[in-house]
UniProtKB/Swiss-Prot annotation:
PROSITE patterns: RIBOSOMAL_L9. It comes from Moorella thermoacetica (strain ATCC 39073 / JCM 9320). SUPFAM superfamilies: L9 N-domain-like, Ribosomal protein L9 C-domain. GO terms for molecular function: rRNA binding; structural constituent of ribosome. It holds the Pfam family Ribosomal_L9_N. This is Large ribosomal subunit protein bL9. The gene is rplI.
Amino acid sequence: MKVILTADVAKLGNRGTLVEVSEGYARNYLLPRGLAVEATAGRLKELDLEKKRREKKENQELENARRQAARLDGAVVKITTRAGETGKLFGSVTNKEIAEAIKNTFQISLDRRKIDLKEPIKALGSYEVTLKLHPTVQAHLRVQVVAEGS
């Protein structure tokens, strides 16, 4: 029997996948638990439309990530913060502060989780930061940390 999965099922497939299973498995396990629906012509058409919509959205996200990477790759963001006499910061520069600096400088709103810091920034200086804009698109940004009043 052909069914369309409505949820991720271990060892069978992910949501939205068309799979062939035995009649008993479908009728006694998948269908009663709402893990799948019977594959009819209408549902197959609906599944195809959903896949096309999802592909279009993914392509738009990829194109948007590429545009952002083109603007941000090799760019420099300046962050001003309080520091002691020796150049050590009072606290550290976080992903959130870098995301705010990118938004203020380039008008690009970026989720802080997409910013990959190799180590915490705890001193003045220039640091290389990797931006993971999409699973296949990365950009490298230089963060320059300067003391207030300099």
